[in-house]
Design a protein with these regions (language model features):
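Metal-dependent catalytic core segments for phosphate chemistry
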Residues: 206, 216-236, 320-325, 385, ...
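A short, acidic, amphipathic alpha-helical segment used as a generic capping/interface helix at domain edges
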Residues: 365-371, 426-441
Length: 487
C-alpha cells in the first residue's frame, strides 16, 4: 500500500464513514459503512438481537439492510464471528447482491458456515411462527441457499501482515483476543499520494481472563491510526471486574456444583453461548474437576450448534492448544447430546448432572427446554455465566427473583430454583483496560461505539482525562445514530 498516513483535514475529504447498525447506540447489530472514491464497503454486518419480540428483531434487521442499499456493497470485512457481527451477511445475497466479497481472518470459514446455517434455520422457523399469527406474509431474512452463496465468496487472509485487497484497499488483521481467531482490523484506504488508516477494534479481549482462555489467541495492541472506532461495552466505571472477582466466581462455580450435584444429587443448568463461551466453560469445569477420579457427575453439552463448533475448533487448533482441547474433550464425564430425542431423554432424567446448553440468554435453543424443567424445582440450580438483555428470558429470570411465576412461551412456570449469577466470565475488555489501550494509540480521534449511553459517557470522560494527563490531543467522540465521519 503506497503513500504515508495523512493527517485529517489536510486533504480533500473523500472518505465517509457511518455507523449504521445497532452498535451506534447499543451492543448488537454491528455495521459500519465506508464510502470512498465512488465505492461502498462494510465493516461487519451483524444481527440486532436486542428486541424482546421476534417481530421486533425482524423489523430491526430489515431496517439495517434498507439503510445500506445492498446491491451497492462491494465488500464486507469481518472482525470476528459472533452473530451480532456477521449474522446478516447472507441477507445481501437474498437482496440480489451475488458479487460481494467477504473478507475474514484465516481459518474462520468453518465457523462462519455453522453460524450462518444455524441463523438461517432460526430465521425460517421464526418467520413460520410470524405467518401463523397474522395476515401479513413474512419471508426469512435468508435461507440456507443464500448461506451457500455467501460461503463461495469468502476470502480468508493471513493475520499479522498488510494484505492488498485491491488498488484502494488493504487490511491488516491483529489478534483481538475476544474469541478464537477474532481480530482488530486496520483498514488502509489508498488515495494515490496518501493513505488513510482506520482501526476497527470489533470486540476486544478481557485481559483479566485471557490466560484462562487457552483456545484463544492473546490480544495484541495496535499502535497508530488516523482514527479508531472502538468498542465500549464495559465502559462503565462501576461493575468493572477486578482480579479477585475472577477467582471468587471460579470458586463459587465449584461450590455450587459440589452442593447441588454431589451432595444433593440434583441438576445445575449453565445456559451458555455456543461460540467461545461453551468451550471456555467446559475447560473451566475440566480444570475444576477433571483430575478428580471420584467426580462422576455427567457434563452434558446439549446444543447441536455448539457440538458442530467444537468440531470446528478441533480442525482449527494446532500444537499445544490442540493437545489441551483433545485432553478436555476426552474427559470421561463429557456427554455430547445431538438428537432431539436424546435431549428429551436427558431432560426427563432428574439425576445429578451439569447441563451446558445454548443459548446463554435463553432466547432459543435447548436451554429453553431445560429451564422449563429446572425453574420449578427448588432442588435444582441455574448458573448464569454471561450478559443477558433485560427483555430476554434470562434477563427476566435474573431480575424476577421475587416473582412466583415466570412466563415461558406464554405458559407460567413456578419460579423456585436456585439462581446464581457470575459476572467475571465476560470476554469483553473492561473499563480500565479500555482507557489504557485507547490512550496508548497514536491517533487523532477515538469514536466510541458498541456500548450503552452511560458506558460511552463514562469511558469518554475517563479517557479524555487520561489523554490530558499524558499531554495527548486525541479527541474522543461518542457515536450516535446518524453520526458521519469524514476523512
Amino acid at each position: 500500500m503506497k503513500g504515508g498516513l495523512v493527517p485529517l483535514g489536510k486533504k480533500k475529504k473523500e472518505v465517509t464513514i457511518e455507523i449504521i447498525g445497532g452498535n451506534a447506540e447499543g451492543v448488537t447489530g454491528s455495521c459500519t459503512r465506508i464510502d470512498f472514491y465512488g465505492r461502498t464497503i462494510l465493516f461487519e454486518l451483524g444481527m440486532v438481537q436486542d428486541n424482546s419480540t421476534i417481530l421486533g428483531n425482524y423489523k430491526d434487521n430489515c431496517a439495517i439492510l434498507n439503510r445500506i442499499k445492498p446491491k451497492k456493497i462491494e465488500m464486507v470485512i469481518l472482525g470476528h464471528n459472533h452473530c451480532d457481527h456477521i449474522g446478516l451477511v447472507p441477507m445481501l445475497f437474498a437482496r440480489g447482491n451475488t458479487d460481494v466479497k467477504i473478507i475474514t481472518p484465516k481459518d474462520t470459514t468453518c465457523i462462519l458456515r455453522e453460524m450462518w446455517s444455524d441463523t438461517a434455520f432460526i430465521n425460517e422457523r421464526d418467520t413460520e411462527a410470524l405467518n401463523r399469527k397474522g395476515d401479513k406474509c413474512y419471508t426469512p431474512l435468508y435461507t440456507q441457499a443464500e448461506v451457500e452463496m455467501a460461503l463461495k465468496n469468502v476470502i480468508e487472509i493471513e493475520v499479522g501482515s498488510i494484505i492488498d485487497i485491491d488498488e484502494n484497499v488493504a487490511i491488516r488483521y491483529t489478534p483481538a483476543g475476544h474469541i478464537l481467531r477474532s481480530c482488530q482490523t486496520e483498514l488502509y484506504i489508498n488515495g494515490g499520494s496518501h493513505t488513510r488508516k482506520i482501526l476497527f477494534t470489533s470486540d476486544l479481549s478481557n485481559r483479566m481472563i485471557e490466560d484462562r482462555k487457552v483456545f484463544v489467541e492473546k490480544f495484541q495492541p495496535v499502535t497508530s491510526a488516523n482514527i479508531v472506532i472502538g468498542e465500549s461495552t464495559y465502559g462503565k466505571r462501576k461493575g468493572s471486574m477486578k482480579k479477585k472477582d475472577i477467582e471468587l466466581d471460579r470458586q463459587k462455580m465449584k461450590t455450587v456444583i459440589e452442593q447441588f450435584c454431589i451432595d444433593n444429587k440434583h441438576r445445575v443448568l449453565i445456559p451458555t453461548f455456543s461460540l467461545d463461551r461453551m468451550p471456555f466453560i467446559i475447560w473451566e469445569l475440566y480444570q475444576l474437576f477433571g483430575k478428580d477420579e471420584s467426580f462422576t457427575v455427567p457434563v452434558l453439552i446439549d446444543s447441536p450448534l455448539a457440538n458442530r463448533l467444537l468440531d470446528c475448533y478441533s480442525s482449527i487448533l494446532d500444537g499445544e492448544t490442540k493437545d489441551k482441547f483433545n485432553e478436555m474433550m476426552s474427559w470421561k464425564n463429557i456427554h455430547r447430546i445431538i438428537t432431539p430425542e436424546d435431549s428429551k431423554a436427558a431432560i426427563s432424567d432428574k439425576g445429578a448432572k451439569i447441563i451446558c446448553a445454548s443459548s446463554g440468554m435463553l432466547c432459543a435453543g435447548r436451554s429453553v427446554k431445560w429451564i422449563q424443567s429446572i425453574l420449578p424445582n427448588e432442588n435444582d440450580c441455574c448458573l448464569f455465566v454471561g450478559y443477558a438483555g433485560i427483555d430476554t428470558l434470562a434477563g427476566k429470570i435474573k431480575h424476577g427473583t421475587g416473582q412466583k411465576t415466570i412466563n415461558i412461551n406464554g405458559k407460567p412456570y413456578k419460579n423456585k430454583c436456585c439462581l446464581v449469577d457470575l459476572h467475571s466470565y465476560s470476554s469483553h475488555m473492561q473499563h480500565d483496560d479500555l482507557v489504557k489501550y485507547y490512550k496508548s494509540i497514536n491517533c487523532e480521534k477515538v469514536y466510541l461505539v458498541h456500548g450503552d449511553e452511560q458506558a460511552r459517557i463514562e469511558l469518554k470522560e475517563d479517557l479524555e482525562k487520561a489523554l490530558g494527563d499524558c499531554c495527548k490531543s486525541t479527541r474522543v467522540v461518542i457515536v450516535n445514530k446518524g453520526t458521519k465521519i469524514s476523512l
